[in-house]
Amino acid sequence: MDTDILQMQDKEVFEAVVNETVRQTETLELIASENFTSRAVMQACGSVMTNKYAEGYPGKRYYGGCEFVDVAENLARDRAKKLFNCSYVNVQPHSGSSANMAVLFSVLKPGDRIMGLDLSHGGHLTHGSPVNFSGQLYEAHSYGVRRETGCIDMNMVEELANKVRPKLIICGASAYSQGFDFKAFREIADRIGALLMADIAHPAGLIVAGLLSDPVPHCHFVTTTTHKTLRGPRGGMIMMGSDFENPLGITIKTKTGSRVKMMTEVMDAEVMPGIQGGPLMHIIAGKAVAFAEALRPEFRDYALQVKKNAAVMADKFSSLGYTIVSGGTKNHLMLLDLRNKNVNGKVAENLLHQAGITVNKNMVPFDDKSPFVTSGIRIGTPAMTTRGMKESDSERIVELIDRVVSAAETPAVDDVCRLVRQEIRELCLQHPMDGYEMTP
């Protein structure tokens, strides 16, 4: 990573970048929503594309001089369509939350009912949490998981849908280790006349690799982030499998009168000028690069290894007496309920950080602790797999995590963390990342 100019011009920021580079290269990243982009993606994101304003869409901009950023955006859109096998893509959302906001704004009016997975059961803020716009502008109702299994019960989903009759059902999660039955969700939505949105921000990379069920044929809208398992730059995206007339009946004037706008037209207008102005063209260029990478055969090998590593870790944790919510994992993550280990999520996160392992504390279903403490931790394998780690490494990592958690209430905990940190550093240095070396 070439930083010689930054070092000369701004030593304080340079130092922060150096320290973050050391953290990423010499400690173990197990946060399920994080990954490492390629050097090509980073170069695109750090390119002259960052200088260009480009309000509007390719061929229909409000600014001149957009002919080359148009190329980048068209590449991103075309590659995403091929990757997800969809007919419509908007690559301009700055984040997954922005993408979700655009969808909700495009089909709902304030006060309309929505239904999504409860945040404390593994959902996301934008699926109806009362602290988020989605729970403040709309009447939000939440489905959850069964206490006995930790899994979503479609009978419970249907019962709630019939009771509250939402206009939009959201299926997706940020801390749920099983898959979603998109076909069953669509059948429920159709029976009550609701629209269906899939938020696949977490498993998108596994979905395009064919390792999890595809939401595009079943859902009216599909949103995702472009990082996480897709391994691109931080950003969002909206997709549709097919177009249809917008349900709000928004019209547009024509030479002969007016017509109802198609949903894709409404969606584009909701992203810009609805909730955003100028798109981040350097990030869109990075998205285009990442989508090309995900279209290569080796990306499926990567995604398959992500899933294998997660399965091995889940099995190893279970053998050591840990409780995994839902009983295991079918994707890239797992949620550990630490209550039988007499350690809360906050303590575990802090001790593992001290030991060179980055995870995040996370509420578990029916948690009796606050979101700032929690009873669990969330663990994911995308970043470690990008480094080239495999099943044997996964088992070793679980053993190291167990050493730290088991020592949490003992006088030896600091020594244990220090020794584990040394082992983690050695493991990480055995799996270096191309392009992450500092070259001032």
From Swiss-Prot:
InterPro entries per the UniProt record, alphabetical: PyrdxlP-dep_Trfase, PyrdxlP-dep_Trfase_major, PyrdxlP-dep_Trfase_small, Ser_HO-MeTrfase, Ser_HO-MeTrfase-like, Ser_HO-MeTrfase_PLP_BS, SHMT-like_dom
Assembly notes: Homodimer.
Annotated residues for binding of (6S)-5,6,7,8-tetrahydrofolate: 119, 123-125, 370-372
Name this protein carries in UniProt: Serine hydroxymethyltransferase
Any GO BP: tetrahydrofolate interconversion
Enzyme class: transferase
Organism from which the protein derives: Chlorobium phaeobacteroides (strain DSM 266 / SMG 266 / 2430)
Subcellular localization, as worded in the UniProt entry: Cytoplasm
Main location class: cytoplasm
Site label Plays an important role in substrate specificity, positions: 227
Entry EC no(s): 2.1.2.1
Known cofactor(s): pyridoxal 5'-phosphate
UniProt similarity note: Belongs to the SHMT family.
Chemical reaction(s) catalysed: (6R)-5,10-methylene-5,6,7,8-tetrahydrofolate + glycine + H2O = (6S)-5,6,7,8-tetrahydrofolate + L-serine
Encoding gene per record: glyA
One GO cellular component, as annotated: cytosol
GO MF annotations in UniProt: glycine hydroxymethyltransferase activity; pyridoxal phosphate binding
Function: Catalyzes the reversible interconversion of serine and glycine with tetrahydrofolate (THF) serving as the one-carbon carrier. This reaction serves as the major source of one-carbon groups required for the biosynthesis of purines, thymidylate, methionine, and other important biomolecules. Also exhibits THF-independent aldolase activity toward beta-hydroxyamino acids, producing glycine and aldehydes, via a retro-aldol mechanism.
UniProt cross-references to HAMAP family, sorted A to Z: SHMT
Keywords linked to the UniProt accession: Amino-acid biosynthesis, Cytoplasm, One-carbon metabolism, Pyridoxal phosphate, Transferase
Sites of N6-(pyridoxal phosphate)lysine modification: 228
Regions annotated as coiled coil: none
